[in-house]
Every structure is written in structure tokens, then in C-alpha cells.
Regions:
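Short glycine/proline-enriched loop/turn "hinge" motifs that connect secondary-structure elements
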Residues: 23-29, 102-107, 318-323, 415-417, ...
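Extended, folded cores of ATP/NTP-driven motor/assembly subunits in large transport
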Residues: 1-400
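The start of beta-strands in P-loop NTPase/AAA+ ATPase cores
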Residues: 31, 109-111, 469, 629, ...
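Hydrophobic positions in the central parallel beta-sheet of the AAA+
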Residues: 35, 113, 442, 631-633, ...
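Short, cationic low-complexity segments
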Residues: 132-161, 354, 446-451, 796-823
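Conserved P-loop NTPase
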Residues: 751-810
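P-loop NTPase motor domains
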Residues: 40, 47, 51-63, 263, ...
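Conserved P-loop NTPase motor cores
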Residues: 428-461, 470-479, 496-504, 636-756, ...
Length: 841
């Protein structure tokens, strides 16, 4: 059936002529250069930084010639998260993590900037001369070629000023990004479909009716700020966000944030600044002032307006500020009537939050939408703008965006604080490359119950799956589930869990190496180990004793290297010293006061066959930990044992130092949990100090986790080694320490900005999701708060609740059962319970 209603084609009314060399040329001979704008991330900007951004915008706009238009468009489009499950090599937990966020809605944000050079005549036109209202468009020719060249030079200056600001980056759009290609839609196409999809943009009919505008099924509502009476009495660059502020800290957002990311519906927030002839504006104002003065006796409002106009003129002349015209609008859309009513009310409420008067505009929606076409800002109706100064106009610019994915191939997945979707964060390599940090070491501080274990499990799992060697030192069995999961997945090749139990005591063989070779580091570690067994912590060996011990170790190594039939272990070493080495020192006539061999053997006897600790150094398992990628030393049962703990400590350090030196080009991490307190002997302190200062040279990182910062500073060596050599600081919920946070701030050298971010942790968590927030600071210059949200599968793997761990083991059928199968069942059960709670019948 033929359409009998009068319809107009988009082609006939289309205001753009072409895109040449990245410049949009309109049929009215306007030139427009388009940029994509990279704004700072939400909740990471301070009041001073907002001021600096504001100042940069002002400097940049001032370089543009007269009759230029600055149009900044912030697009906020609802989308759903698409999990990255294409990689066939994904582990069970990685896949579970991605699927946990499947189809989670979020508000995607893109910011574009259009700099347009128009003419004096065009800038004065009203809505009745808009290209929508004219019968036909005849392309005009650019008559002043020099003006076009000057404008393009000014645009380059504008771009350079903004990029040099350090807060905002502009990227000039290429021709294909504006016009699109056969495979991908361009920006203009996206505007006509109100979509940010890169794959397809479905063009739909545009319906213009009195009081209503539709694009396909999307119904548009428009709120405008087009009069000074709509604005609050005072504009500022930023505002305090109460939900994440405390009486001791501030969380700042840009003044226009309520109509930005805080407005959770599909919308475009457009900000226009029109640069006219400043002298002409002031002359017009002078004339208006005189007219109102002459008419003031007839109306009080004329007198008031004359007074305001005089104040405007005084401000312009005394401070030399630039008079401009300004307009802002929010175009929101929805597909059904109920949602349309909701977004209309929400938009009005958010404008009211800015202390602006919400003006719901129905008549001018098509005209203002049409002027928002990229490159068509010169078509904006002049009666919809108001006079102000550049400083005030720029206050209405939205100043933040969503969290961004790091471009680095390495990193961890954490959740966006605003939308709750995964973001890729690199806290090691890229910051190092950019000079933000000088080492990869990390200091993690969080009280009990703040989510430390979940965060560290989440961290080390992702490091391991990206090829890193992980060595964990723990008390409390926090990593038991993850270690067993890795052990099962690798069929025992990885996931080595070393702990002390009565029926399965901890045991090593310091004389075993997979290659049968003993380098200098291995010999030194054996010497240090035996010296620790022989001498008390406060007892220093004589030089002659050190020489004798080194000689014994070297002689025994020579013997076992020459005769491979000898099984090397501590028992063999003890017997070698008892017989062979005794003979050797007698031949050398070593005096007893220089080396008391009988006293030496007497002290070491408990570790020899039949002694109380004969299990410790005589393991029959041929296990070289250097090649194992995930090792957990669980020290809970020996943390107070003065004999076992020093020995195990040395084994740990020897293992990691061997990894450091031998594994070239492979990432290494040692993570020391709360047990570091028990390891703070004089020897261990020196090890920690050495480790934190040198691990960066071997592509490694040392991580210390603690509940109390005071525990760290009680040891001057540790304070100097750990805090001063950890450029990455990670803090969890500090609300229970809020009254003494100044102490923590001083010890860790935190800035006021970082303090505000840390104290905002968990202040405004989403009620429908279970997660804990974590603050990550890099080098004192780059910091943000993220959410540690894990899947149900990860939850049951990482949990430290004893009842939940026992339930997992029960369903798995004991240590030999299928842990993955048990976790799948429990996770599914938990999801079903959550569905029943959220959807009760």
C-alpha cells in the first residue's frame, strides 16, 4: 500500500556536504573538525584537578577565531557486558568469572568534540531558518580561504593545549570514523540510530510530530538549559558527592556529573559554546542597558535587568573575560511509555541536583536534535542560547568517564566501581614502563573481614594463569582451595602445598637438585641453613667456623657429584662429617677452639636419623621447587616453633632466590601473608630487605599483606625495606581506623586525594551485588578504587569460612575427590537460592 502521507527524505534535508581530510564540510560552507575526547576516570579527580581541566578548556577555546562553535557531546548508551570466553585455553575459574558478568547492563560513555567555523550570519539564525524548515539546500562555496586556514591552525593549537594539560586527551577522528565504511558505521550514522555499536547501526525512520519525536521505536525527550534563569546563582567546576564523602574526606565530581554518568539511562548531554564578536556583544549590552535604564521608571524588572547588565559589563571590562553564548541540553530516549516517563522524571531530578531549573522542551526537540548532527552546530537556533562568560560556560562541561581497560597485554580483571563490569588493570608492567613506579613490589593493608583473602586469591590466580611463578607464605590456609584446584588441573605438576601435620610433617632435601649441579647460590643456601641449625639467632659464628662449615659442605658435594649412586640428604651429610670430614680436619690439624666438630655434630643430631626432627631435611621426594609455578608454604602449625620455623624460612627464601636467578625472563612473585611477623628474625629481616631491593632486577615482585600498619613499622629494617620499596600500595576498607587514619596516611605517605579515595571505599555499594572495594595506588600519582567481585565458583574456591570449606570437601568426597565438581554443584545451588530470593513466588 502506498504511503499517502507527506514524507521527506533524509537526503534532501541532509545538512552535510562531504568530509575532506578529516574535516566535515556542511552545505552552508561550515567547517568542522571532530575529536574523540579521553576524560579522566570517575572518582579519581580532585577539586584542584577539576580547576586545572577548567583552565585548560578556557585557554584552548580562546585560541579559536570569532564565529566558532565548540560542541561537546557526551553519549551515554545502555549496553550489556559480553563475556570473553572465546579463548579455548581459559581455566575453569577464569571462564566462571567472565560468565558471572554475562549480560550485566552498564552505561557506555563516549565523548566527542566538534569545533565548527561558521559565519556571522549563520550564528544569528533562529529555529525558523533551520535546515529542517527550508525547502531545499543549495551548497555554498567557502569564499574566505584564509579564514579556513586560520581556523585549522587554531584547531591544531586547541588540540595541543588540551593534550599538554595532562588530564584530557583529544584524538582527531579520521574520515572513515565519521562517514563509516561498508563494515563499520561512522559517527554520523551512529547519531541517526542513537547507538554506539561498532558492528551495525540500523537506520530507522525519523518521526516528527507536535510534542513528540521518535527515531524508530525510540521516543526522545529533551531538557534544555537555554536561559540564565535556569542556572543556579553560582557555578563551580566541581561538586561534593555526598554518597562517597565522609566528615573527614571529600569525593569530588564535575558540576555536570548528575547529567553524565550519574544519570543511568540512554542519553546524550550536549554542551555548546558560541564564540561571537566580543566587542559587538558588549556594544549590544551597552545599548540594552541604556534602553532599560530609560524604561526603568515603568517597570521594576527593567531596573533590575539594567543592574544585572551593568554588572555583566563591569565584569567583562575589569577582568577581561570573554563574553560568549552557551547552551546545554540532555536528549534522553526510551522505547516504552513507562520507561519514557521514568527517564523524563530522572533527567529533571538530576538537573535539579545541579540546582538548575529543569525545562522540559517539547516544541524544539527536532531542531535541537538536528543541530546536534556532527558538523551541523552552525545550524543551532540562536534564541536557545544565553549570554555568559567563557569561565561559567565551561563549568557546565561533563568532566569524567568510565574506567578504561589498560592497553597492556598483562594485568588483572577487577570490576568497574560505577557499572560493576570487568576492567583490565595493569598494576605492574605498564606503570613501570611509563615511569609511574620504579618497582613492582606491593604492600597490601586491610583489617580482618575487609576482603583481603579474596583479593589476593584473585590476584595470584590471574598472575599464575598468565605464566608467572607464584610462591605464597601463609598462615590460615587462605590459599588451600586455589592450590588444590591448580594441583588437580595440572595433574600434580603444580599447586604444591607444603604444611606441617603430625602424620605428614613438613620435609625437604636441601641437597637435592634436579640437574645434580650445585651453583654458588645453592652452596651458600646450604651453608646458611646448617649455620641456622647450629648457632642461635643471637650467637655469631667465628670466621674459622664459617670456613670449616663451608669446607664440609663443599667436600660432601664433591663426593656425591663423583659418585651418583650416593643418595644425597642430610643424613648422608651428617655421616660424612662424622667420619670423612673428621679425618680431613685432623690431617689439617684444625684446633678444637677453631672448630669443635663434636659440638657441631651434637647440635645437629636432632635432625639426623632417629632424632626428633629427622623428617625435616631427609625427604625422599625428589622435588625441585624451582620449576614449580604455584607453591604454598602454610606455616600456621609451626609459627611458634623456634626450631622448625627458621629452617622452613630459609628453605622458602632459598627457593625464591633460586627462581629469581635461574628463571630468566619469567615473572616471579613472592607473597608473604600475616606470617611475616613470625619471620622477623635478624636473618629474615636481612633477606626481606635484600628481596625488596633487588627483586625488580629479576622481573619479580615481592608482596606483603598485613592487617596493622603498626606491625610493619615496629621493625625499622622492615619499614625501610617494605614500605619504602613498594611503589604499589593496596588498601582495603579502613572505616574501623577512620579516627586514626592520619597516622596511616603519614606512615604510607598518602596524599589528600588518596585519603579521600580510600575513605570512600564501600560507602555506596550496589545493594544487589556482593563485592568488596579495594584501593590501588601507584607511585603516589595514579590511583583508583575498584571492586573485587568474584563468581560463585571463585567464592567457594577462595572462601576462608571453615563451614563452607568443610562443605566443599564433603561434597568433593575428601582430598582425592573432584574439587571442581563439588564447587560447580555448590555454585549452582547458590545461584538457584539467589533466584528464589529475588523472584519469590
Amino acid at each position: 500500500m502506498r504511503n499517502v502521507l507527506k514524507a521527506e527524505t533524509l537526503e534532501r534535508r541532509f545538512p552535510l556536504l562531504s568530509v575532506e581530510n578529516g574535516c566535515i564540510v556542511s552545505k552552508d560552507a561550515d567547517l568542522t573538525v571532530a575529536f574523540e575526547v579521553e576524560l579522566p576516570e570517575l572518582y579519581t579527580v580532585t577539586a584542584d584537578e577539576y580547576e586545572a581541566m577548567h583552565s585548560s578548556w578556557i585557554k584552548a577555546v580562546k585560541v579559536l577565531p570569532e564565529h566558532s562553535v565548540v560542541c561537546k557531546q557526551d553519549w551515554f548508551v545502555k549496553e550489556t557486558y559480553r563475556p570473553k570466553t572465546d579463548d579455548g585455553e581459559q581455566s575453569f575459574l577464569t571462564r566462571s568469572y567472565e560468565l558471572h558478568f554475562n549480560e550485566r547492563p552498564y552505561l557506555n560513555h563516549k565523548c566527542y568534540l566538534f569545533l565548527t567555523k561558521t559565519t556571522r550570519e549563520r550564528s544569528r539564525r533562529k529555529s525558523d531558518f533551520n535546515t529542517l524548515c527550508r525547502g531545499f539546500l543549495l551548497p555554498k562555496e567557502i569564499t574566505d580561504k584564509d579564514a579556513a586556514a586560520r581556523f585549522l591552525e587554531a584547531v591544531e593549537q586547541f588540540e595541543r593545549i588540551m593534550n599538554d594539560s595532562g588530564h584530557i586527551r583529544l584524538r582527531r577522528l579520521e574520515t572513515d570514523e565519521i562517514t563509516g565504511t561498508k563494515e563499520r558505521p561512522g559517527l554520523v550514522e551512529k547519531y541517526f540510530s542513537l547507538s554506539l555499536e561498532d558492528e551495525t547501526a540500523v537506520l530507522q525512520d525519523i518521526c516528527l510530530k507536535p510534542g513528540r519525536m521518535r527515531i524508530g521505536d525510540k521516543r526522545l525527550c529533551l531538557h534544555t538549559l537555554s536561559d540564565t534563569e535556569d542556572l543556579p546563582g553560582r557555578l563551580s567546576t566541581d561538586m561534593r558527592y555526598e554518597r562517597m564523602s565522609t566528615d573527614r574526606s571529600d569525593c569530588r565530581l564535575s558540576f555536570a556529573a548528575p547529567v553524565g554518568l550519574l544519570l543511568s539511562c540512554n542519553h546524550i548531554y550536549s554542551q555548546y559554546v558560541f564564540i561571537d564578536d566580543a566587542q559587538e556583544i558588549l556594544q549590544m549590552m551597552e545599548k540594552n542597558s541604556r534602553n532599560m535604564l530609560s524604561l526603568s521608571k515603568y517597570s521594576r524588572s527593567n531596573a533590575i535587568n539594567q543592574e544585572w547588565t551593568e554588572m555583566y559589563l563591569d565584569e567583562a571590562h575589569t577582568k577581561g573575560v570573554l563574553p560568549v553564548r552557551c547552551h546545554c541540553n540532555v536528549i534522553a530516549w526510551a522505547e516504552d511509555a513507562e520507561e519514557f516517563r521514568r527517564i523524563r522524571n530522572d533527567t529533571g531530578s538530576q538537573l535539579a541536583m545541579m540546582e538548575c531549573t529543569p525545562r522540559y522542551n517539547t516544541i524544539d526537540t527536532p531542531v535541537i536534535y538536528w543541530a546536534g548532527i556532527p558538523g551541523n552546530a552552525g545550524d543551532f537556533p540562536s534564541e536557545e542560547s544565553f549570554y555568559t562568560f567563557l569561565e561559567q560556560a565551561v563549568c557546565l562541561f561533563a568532566g569524567e568517564t568510565n574506567y578504561r581497560n589498560s592497553p597492556s597485554p598483562f594485568g588483572i580483571r577487577l570490576a568497574d566501581r560505577q557499572n560493576g563490569i570487568p576492567v583490565h588493570v595493569d598494576i605492574s608492567d605498564l606503570p613501570m614502563k611509563r615511569g609511574i613506579i620504579t618497582n613492582r613490589n606491593k604492600f597490601i593493608l586491610g583489617p580482618s573481614g575487609s576482603g583481603k583473602s579474596f583479593f589476593t586469591n584473585h590476584l595470584v590466580r590471574q598472575y599464575y594463569e598468565q605464566g608467572a611463578h607464584i610462591l605464597l607464605v601463609d598462615t590460615g590456609n587462605s590459599y588451600q582451595g586455589l592450590c588444590r584446584m591448580i594441583h588437580d588441573r595440572t595433574n600434580g605438576k603444580d599447586g604444591i602445598y607444603i604444611t606441617y601435620e603430625e602424620d605428614n610433617p613438613i620435609s625437604f632435601n636441601p641437597f637435592y637438585t634436579e640437574s645434580g649441579k650445585f651453583d654458588v647460590e645453592k652452596r651458600d643456601s646450604i651453608n646458611t641453613l646448617i649455620l641456622t641449625l647450629w648457632k642461635r639467632e643471637d650467637e655469631s659464628p667465628k670466621r674459622s667456623e664459617e670456613v670449616a662449615l663451608s669446607g664440609a659442605v663443599n667436600a660432601y658435594i664433591r663426593k656425591i657429584s663423583e659418585n651418583r649412586n650416593i643418595r644425597p640428604d642430610f643424613n648422608g651429610f651428617y655421616e660424612f662429617v662424622t667420619e670423612d670430614y673428621r679425618r680431613m680436619i685432623e690431617e689439617k690439624k684444625v684446633r678444637e677452639k677453631d672448630f669443635d666438630i663434636d659440638g657441631f655434630l651434637n647440635v645437629l643430631e636432632p635432625f639426623y636419623r632417629g632424632g626428633d626432627y629427622d623428617f625435616l631435611l631427609n625427604s625422599d621426594k625428589e622435588l625441585d621447587l624451582t620449576g614449580k609455578r604455584f607453591i604454598v608454604f602454610e606455616l600456621d602449625n609451626i609459627s611458634s616453633n623456634k626450631v622448625l620455623l627458621p629452617v622452613v624460612t630459609l628453605i622458602i627464601m632459598e627457593t625464591f632466590i633460586a627462581k629469581m636467578r635461574r628463571l630468566k625472563g619469567i615473572r616471579k612473585m613472592i607473597l608473604i601473608e600475616e606470617c611475616w611477623k613470625a619471620l622477623m628474625s635478624a636473618n629474615m629481616s636481612e633477606y626481606i630487605k635484600y628481596l625488596f631491593k633487588t627483586v625488580r632486577k629479576y622481573f619479580g615482585e615481592a608482596v606483603v599483606v598485613t592487617q596493622e600498619v603498626d606491625d610493619i613499622i615496629s621493625s625499622p629494617i622492615v619499614k625501610e625495606a617494605i614500605i619504602n620499596n613498594s611503589d604499589c600500595k593496596i588498601l582495603l576498607d579502613q572505616r574501623k581506623y577512620i579516627n586514626k587514619f592520619e597516622h596511616i596516611q603519614r606512615l604510607l605517605g598518602l596524599t589528600e586525594k588518596e585519603k579521600g579515595q580510600i575513605l570512600s571505599i564501600n560507602q555506596a555499594n550496589h545493594p544487589g551485588r556482593f563485592y568488596r572495594e579495594v584501593w590501588i595506588g601507584l607511585g603516589g600519582t595514579c590511583s583508583a578504587v575498584y571492586a573485587t567481585e568474584v563468581s560463585e565458583e571463585e567464592y567457594f574456591t577462595f572462601t576462608t569460612e571453615e563451614s563452607e570449606k568443610l562443605e566443599v570437601q564433603r561434597i568433593a568426597g575428601g582430598p582425592e575427590g573432584s574439587l571442581e565438581g563439588a564447587i560447580r554443584r555448590l555454585a549452582e545451588k547458590k545461584r538457584e537460592e539467589q533466584k528464589q530470593v529475588s523472584n519469590p513466588k
